[in-house]
Amino acid sequence: VHWEDAEKQYIVSVFSKIDVDHVGANTLERVLIVFPWTKRYFNSFGDLSSPGAIKHNNKVSAHGRKVLAAIIECTRHFGNIKGHLANLSHLHSEKLHVDPHNFRVLGQCLRIELAAALGFKEFTPERNAYFQKFMDVISHSLGREYH
């Protein structure tokens, strides 16, 4: 994947403009609420029976922060995101058996949360496309062990 300097710079800069803990937690909450079948991967998290239960679940919040931290770490590896995520790809395919489509769902929810946090003047359609590309590369990289 070829990355333009403007794409990389904007993607990196976004994470200094948002509350990473809040956006990470909200992203995973959104995934679990809007795409309820994803809850099957989080049986050990306790009560996920309603949107309120999900939003008040500390394990969901903590895991959302962890997931976003892993996404942010990918900004240090633009030249080799696939290689960087190889171990996570193996874990998700071989041990956790996560449907690879859910990685795309996560990317969609993250872009929604970023748009809400940054506003339309900052998170323009062009910049949204940068993040779609970034999350598509991450999704593909995480799903590569499935092929």
Swiss-Prot record:
One MF term in the entry's GO annotations: haptoglobin binding
Record's GO cellular component terms: blood microparticle; haptoglobin-hemoglobin complex; hemoglobin complex
GO annotation terms (biological process): hydrogen peroxide catabolic process
Domain (Globin) ranges: 2-147
Keyword Metal-binding appears in the UniProt entry: yes
Binding site for heme b: H63, H92
Gene3D superfamilies: Globins
One Pfam family here: Globin
UniProt keyword terms in alphabetical order: Heme, Iron, Metal-binding, Oxygen transport, Transport
SUPFAM superfamilies documented for this protein: Globin-like
Subunit structure: Heterotetramer of two alpha chains and two beta chains.
Protein family per UniProt: Belongs to the globin family.
Biological role stated in the UniProt entry: Involved in oxygen transport from the lung to the various peripheral tissues.
Name of the featured protein: Hemoglobin subunit beta
Organism of provenance: Lepidosiren paradoxus
